[in-house]
Amino acid sequence: MEELQGYLEKDKSWQQHLLYPLLFQEYIYALAHDHSLSGSIFYEPVEVFGYDKKSSLALVKRLNTRIYQQNFLISSVNGSNQKRLVGXNNFFXSLFXSQMIIESFAIFXEILFLRALVSFFGEKKVLKYPNLPSIHSIFPFLEXKLPHLNYVSDILIPHPIHMXILVQILQCWIQDVPFLHSLRFFLHEYHNWNSLLITHKKSICLFSKENKRLFRFLYNSYVSEFEFLLVFFRKQSSYLRLRSSGTFLERTHFYGKIEHFQIXHFAFYSSMSXLFPVVXLKXPFMHYVRYQGKALLASKGTHLVMKKWKYHFVTLWQYYFHFWSQLYRIRINXLSNYSFYFLGYLSSVLINFSAVRNQMLENSFLIDIITKKFDSIIPVILLIESLSKAQFCTVSGHPISKPIWADLSDSDILDRFGWICRNLSHYHSGSSKKQDLYRIKYILRLSCARTLARKHKSTVRTFLRRLGPGLLEEFFTEEERVLSLIFPKTISFILHGSHKERIWYLDIIRMNDLVNYSXLX
């Protein structure tokens, strides 16, 4: 990592020679085993077509050597006009090689962007918050901000139609033309291989797991670009109150226009002048949060301001990212009568009305008080549907056994069910209605008992009577043990009203697969 940092510092033109260290610098291939780096980058090794070897930069080095030594030809496959990369008369070997190179492109780009991010925060001297990466850290923020706001826009960020759009976004960061052309080439080959293997169910199943890292990197680049423009227009809205920002869509010199922000840089195009009028966007108390492809934009402004932001979002996606977005992807609602799904919770702002009698001397009068409180509950129906897809219960919520786990040992079955139950209980600890969480735990408890009874060819009642109810006690005592550690002095009161207590754990860095946002959108 130090050698890569030295290369970046010595050669300031690394953006124009991005492919050089990947192909010719030996030390790059040691980064795959750098533990300090793996802690900063989420690395998920994947298997390719039954190969036991994982994605490794060292493997890419050997593949590059093969490319130098052998004659990799561009030939047609099955007599079609589409050109594919075929080496040593082995299509699948060539496919494996290209997938490894694509994976290495993503790893190396992550390294460079991580270095740029670290240097940026180092220059800005931003304070480091250890709990900031936690997903649950969003909810205390929503608890503090949303009760004071009026409207919220529920946004589903659209996906670009063509992969070339994602590559074009990288052009503002990377000026290495061979690297970009290579990336386009392998993405084109990926599309061809995908269409070729569509008839082979086993192959397409394994192939669908590939290149997640690259696509995630490209998608994150797209979202980062979108949010960068959003923040810029938000900050400059007061300055651009009477001016058009259509010329900012010329992204090649966008950063230069920011650094030298002068009126002389505005070149008003007649065709774009009406597309991005930034007028009356200086809304007070504007807040934006996002997880994956879903975002929330809340404001204390009026409904008209939110409609203008909606118009700007659609225009930005259409004329800058070159794809059409349906209007239903952005829904504007008043927080007083709207509930939204976000991060596996059904959240809303509750309004409580109360009256206080005030007496001064001989006069008494009533004062009406309105209080707003952020509330989050578990979407039980959707969570039961997720459990049903995972074969823990029926669609109606009736627990069933899991036959695929019946061949495991008793301890493995208990560990798996206990892990899922603790995971859901840990993640949904912020729900204001714990009875719904107890219902989910009850389904998992009976599903575990039915699975064990199925394995031992017995009934659930007979199995529990023989081993005792303490066998599944951990399904109900995990939360009480955590609460007893947090509130040791008031344990009796807390346990008595634990169904109303909400605790946000700040060590959760990913969502449970059963409550992924895509199932709630």
Curated annotation (Swiss-Prot):
<comment type="similarity">
    <text>Belongs to the intron maturase 2 family. MatK subfamily.</text>
</comment>
<dbReference type="GO" id="GO:0006397">
    <property type="term" value="P:mRNA processing"/>
</dbReference>
<dbReference type="Pfam" id="PF01348">
    <property type="entry name" value="Intron_maturas2"/>
</dbReference>
<keyword id="KW-0819">tRNA processing</keyword>
<keyword id="KW-0150">Chloroplast</keyword>
<dbReference type="InterPro" id="IPR024937">
    <property type="entry name" value="Domain_X"/>
</dbReference>
<dbReference type="Pfam" id="PF01824">
    <property type="entry name" value="MatK_N"/>
</dbReference>
<dbReference type="InterPro" id="IPR024942">
    <property type="entry name" value="Maturase_MatK_N"/>
</dbReference>
<dbReference type="GO" id="GO:0008033">
    <property type="term" value="P:tRNA processing"/>
</dbReference>
<protein>
    <recommendedName>
        <fullName>Maturase K</fullName>
    </recommendedName>
</protein>
<dbReference type="GO" id="GO:0009507">
    <property type="term" value="C:chloroplast"/>
</dbReference>
<dbReference type="GO" id="GO:0008380">
    <property type="term" value="P:RNA splicing"/>
</dbReference>
<keyword id="KW-0934">Plastid</keyword>
<keyword id="KW-0507">mRNA processing</keyword>
<dbReference type="GO" id="GO:0003723">
    <property type="term" value="F:RNA binding"/>
</dbReference>
<dbReference type="InterPro" id="IPR002866">
    <property type="entry name" value="Maturase_MatK"/>
</dbReference>
<keyword id="KW-0694">RNA-binding</keyword>
<comment type="function">
    <text>Usually encoded in the trnK tRNA gene intron. Probably assists in splicing its own and other chloroplast group II introns.</text>
</comment>
